[in-house]
């Protein structure tokens, strides 16, 4: 079970890198990306994931143009070469770790892509995400996030779309740990109290001089179990923005959000306000 990474002094346990430190079937190691132009008329999401205790890896790329979605999903048996991230016709090449990478999808079901990511700001390490159902940990993950620009092209059903870094931006995150994946496990005795869901807000924003990454997780009773609001400056400084107060705006009579007002506080106690508007109709 050895792989190329085992040549390097990066081990944290007395076992090969490809063996996860946990035997939990839900252990995962995954990347997520999104890309869009500033008009909001086109949106792209993509990702790749490794699930060593399930023996599989998968990837996807989805493009939304107007009201049309076109997607490709790929899956394969896992391998031990984690430096060569690929699933079928999909691959990720890391140029400069934590700064630049390239996503390529050879033509598959009418979709092809060649997209290069360049971070506009440094990555930010988020707080550890932990969630329990009864006595059991169902989510225990580490993530980092980044805002950046995209360049390259997409091809969809014969249409070539140029991705210009002057107008194409997005966010990405890397996460690894434990979270529910794949088929549902036997439930066992029902949890007491039962899991009633959670409220989740994720807002990555890129400005000219800084980026913002906001993650808030609340239980049904409003208890905030994750509060992460940071500002990442061009020079690499990372500033916490306190305990944000959030007001979600909805379409009247529905649960469809149209935007949000987020009020935070900088290190000197000055208010920092963000008005977020949905580009979806």
Which sequence ranges carry the predicted segments?
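Structured soluble/peripheral alpha/beta segments that form catalytic or ligand/cofactor-binding pockets
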Residues: 1-281
């Amino acid at each position: 079970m050895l792989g190329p990474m085992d040549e390097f002094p990066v081990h944290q346990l007395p076992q090969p890198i490809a063996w996860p430190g946990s035997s939990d079937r839900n252990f995962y190691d995954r990347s997520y990306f999104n890309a869009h132009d500033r008009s909001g008329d086109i949106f792209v999401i993509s990702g790749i994931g490794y699930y060593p205790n399930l023996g599989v890896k998968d990837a996807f790329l989805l493009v939304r143009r107007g009201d049309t979605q076109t997607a490709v999903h790929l899956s394969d048996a896992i391998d031990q070469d984690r430096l060569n991230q690929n699933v079928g016709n999909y691959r990720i090449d890391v140029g400069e770790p934590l700064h630049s990478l390239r996503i390529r999808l050879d033509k598959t079901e009418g979709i092809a892509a060649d997209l290069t990511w360049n971070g506009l700001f440094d990555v930010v390490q988020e707080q550890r995400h932990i969630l329990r159902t009864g006595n059991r940990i169902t989510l225990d993950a580490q993530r980092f996030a980044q805002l950046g620009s995209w360049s390259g092209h997409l091809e969809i059903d014969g249409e070539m779309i140029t991705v210009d870094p002057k107008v194409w931006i997005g966010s990405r995150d890397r996460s690894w740990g434990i979270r529910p994946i794949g088929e549902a496990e036997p439930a066992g005795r029902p949890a007491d109290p039962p899991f009633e869901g959670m409220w989740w807000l994720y807002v990555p924003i890129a400005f000219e001089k800084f980026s913002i990454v906001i993650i808030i997780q609340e239980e049904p009773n409003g208890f905030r179990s994750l509060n992460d609001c940071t500002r990442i400056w061009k020079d690499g400084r990372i500033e916490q923005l306190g305990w944000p107060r959030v007001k979600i705006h909805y379409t009247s009579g529905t649960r469809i959000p149209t935007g949000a007002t987020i009020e935070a506080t900088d290190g000197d106690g000055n208010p920092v306000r963000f008005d977020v508007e949905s580009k979806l109709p």
